[in-house]
Amino acid sequence: MTLRLNRRDFVAGSALLAGTALALGPVRVEAATLAAPEIDRLTIRVLVDSGHELFLDKTDHPMVKVERSGIGIIGGSAALAGINSQWGLSLYIESTAAGVTRRQMLDFGLTPDVLVNNATLLGVDPATLDGLILSHGHGDHYGGLIGFIAKHRAALRPDIALVVGGEDNFCWQYVKKPDGKFTEFGVLDRADLKRLHVPWSTAEEPRLIGDQAISTGRIARESIEKVLPNTYVQYGMHDGAGCDAGHFTAAERQGEIVPNQHWHEHATCFNLRGRGLVVISSCGHAGIINSVKTAQKVTGINKVHAIIGGFHLYPAKADYVAEIVQGIKALDPDVVIPMHCSGVNFVAAAHEMMPDKLVTSTTGNRFTLGV
């Protein structure tokens, strides 16, 4: 089944709230690209991830309030409903500044049934959502989007908007089979967004999302990290969907299926008062160290409080993983919460090399920072 999202001219308005320059965070590294608003509190609920553990350690980290999820009960009745897990990621994020709370959904898992089920069980009210964010154009991050919007369009605010990383989000994606042939991995079809009256805008450059969240824009490739094997991409349009090939180089416009370098990927960040940067990397194809360093450069804030999300290290060999963990440790974050595609080798290496920073996560967990 092809996953599709919609064709829409660039909409800069509703999601591009260039906020007032507020007080900046702890330590500066250089002049900031944009002023990073301070927030007082950040809560992240994992709506979809690849596993659900009932018996993880419930002990809080000194810097994070950790809430583990059990079996859901709908409406207080005796009917039990399970939290579902699948390959993919979706996060429900609440940020609060000066008593004002903003609510964003970052990524949407692979299928709408799992996202809708889990969001309902975990108490997410679609009517309270201020915005939607897509980290990159992989089906396990946008697959639940259209179904979730269609299910809740009447409840969602009329001006709800989607922020994506770049034009590449809308390119056709492919997976190479063992026999060397390609099979479709889906496409974001902008026609669906148009049908559901959801405008979209890009974050190819650093920008604010609403008045509390920050997008890194395109992530600079400056560390030892490399894009590990994943999917393939085709630049151009066919069957009424795809990406505008005029946006790319002459070589990319040849229409060949090539390895995806994820130039469109961006990270979502927050400036937590008195603590520093919280960097959320949904998949980290561009490199988790690169993502953090780009966030530092964009905001001018050196202190990293938390690194959260998918780091795409599950295909990596142990020595490479250890090198990346050492690089993360050198950034001196207070907290590291790996999810999704980070991989068991990363968790094991982090537990060995920086156990005081590691917090584990599964579907349904909620983490509160700034408590």
Sequence positions of predicted segments:
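N-terminal secretory signal peptides and thylakoid transit peptides that target proteins
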Residues: M1-A18
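C-terminal segment of N-terminal export signals and the immediately downstream linker at the start
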Residues: L24-R45
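Conserved beta-strand hairpin/beta-sheet module of binuclear metal-dependent hydrolase folds
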Residues: G51-E53, K58, K65-L122, Q261, ...
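Divalent metal-coordination and catalytic microenvironments
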Residues: I93, A119, H136, Q212, ...
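Active-site metal-binding motif and surrounding structural segment of the metallo-beta-lactamase
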Residues: D113-V164, T299-I308
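Cap/insert and terminal regions of metallo-dependent hydrolase folds
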Residues: G131, H138-Y142, A161, H247-F367
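Active-site neighborhood of divalent metal-dependent phosphoester bond hydrolases
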Residues: G166-R195
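Active-site-proximal loop/helix segment associated with metal-binding centers of metalloenzymes
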Residues: L208-T268, G274
